[in-house]
UniProtKB/Swiss-Prot annotation:
Its main location: plastid. Signal peptide: none annotated. This is Cytochrome c biogenesis protein CcsA. Keywords: Chloroplast, Cytochrome c-type biogenesis, Membrane, Plastid, Thylakoid, Transmembrane, Transmembrane helix. It is a multi-pass membrane protein.
Length: 315
């Protein structure tokens, strides 16, 4: 009996979207109703199930096409979502914090929705590799580059979350009610009551500041990992370009924006390592980098120009 791979792929993609939607609702309801912000087995189960759906989808396309599924924009977006899910699962297991799921689950859900429901059907079909892509460097270069995009985007998104949350947390004021008195004698009950209120406020703000520090540090580490992958991806791409076209660098739009992306995050890391920046300043640089990564990944490819336009919109 013939296996209808497109039907199975459609089922897997729809299942992935539904699972991510339910997982997003779960995270928001858990936080909204005052649930614990610690490790969540249910949330991770949802993410793990979505990751399995994407993994099976990539394997099916690999078997059907005979090559690693990175020949067009649709397949690269699936792999990007796969990398984001894998990286997030690792972060949540390592940090044991639930609040990151509240921030990242809607972003990953939107990416999967765009991939499944916005791209034209023609672009979602498996296509043979053009001669320039028929190389062992395809897996090495493209997978590393997309993995770098995933790490950089997630790190930048956490930095943006830091900027938004800091507006609410840092501006919190410690306001306490005046102590009650009667005949200039301070009652012990009133003093204890007001002291308890003050301690609660300070404890809450101390937790908020610690969480902001956690986000700042997590963003820094995630972007650092992404920068290493980006550097490796650019170097492997240069070697592949020399083997294919006879020169290491041709300054086509994709290469130019990859270099701009590298410079942006090199400045970010330099400001932190050498300049000692922390908090809002590097988060602003990362926010700019968030846009740069999307231009490098999607914007240039949508133009359909340059040596890197293979397999994207010119199908």
């Amino acid at each position: 009996m013939m296996v209808n791979i497109p039907v199975i792929e459609n089922f897997l993609s729809n299942s992935c979207f539904l699972i991510l939607f339910l997982t997003t609702v779960y995270y928001w309801l858990k936080i909204g109703f005052g649930g614990k912000s610690s490790f969540s087995f249910t949330g991770l189960t949802g993410y793990g199930s979505a990751l399995c759906c994407l993994t099976l989808q990539l394997i099916l396309r690999w078997v059907d096409s005979g090559h690693f599924p990175l020949s067009n924009l649709y397949e690269s977006l699936i792999f990007l979502a796969w990398c984001l899910l894998l990286l997030y699962i690792y972060i949540e297991v390592s940090t044991k914090t639930l609040f990151l799921g509240v921030l990242t689950s809607p972003a990953i859900l939107c990416l999967v929705a765009f991939t499944d429901f916005s791209l034209p059907t023609e672009l979602q079909q498996s296509t043979p590799l053009v001669p320039a892509l028929q190389s062992n460097w395809l897996v090495m270069h493209v997978t590393v580059m997309i993995a770098s995009y995933a790490a950089l985007l997630l790190g930048c998104f956490i930095a943006i979350a830091y900027l938004v949350l800091s507006k609410f947390f840092i501006k919190t004021t410690f306001v306490t009610a005046p102590l009650s008195s009667q005949n200039t004698v301070l009652r012990q009950e009133s003093f204890l009551e007001e002291k308890q209120k003050t301690d609660i406020v300070f404890e809450k703000n101390d937790k908020n500041l610690k969480f902001l520090f956690f986000l700042d540090n997590l963003s820094y580490r995630t972007i650092g990992i992404g920068f290493c992958f980006l550097t490796l991806g650019i170097l492997s791409g240069a070697i592949w370009a020399n083997e294919t076209w006879g020169n290491y660098w041709s300054w086509d739009p994709k290469e130019t924006w990859a270099f701009i992306t590298w410079l942006t995050f090199a400045c970010y890391l330099h400001s932190r390592l050498v300049g000692g920046w922390t908090g809002s300043k590097p988060a602003l640089v990362a926010s700019f980098g968030f846009l740069v990564v999307w231009v490098c990944y999607l914007g240039v490819n949508l133009l359909g120009q340059g040596l890197h336009s293979y397999g994207f919109l010119n199908v």
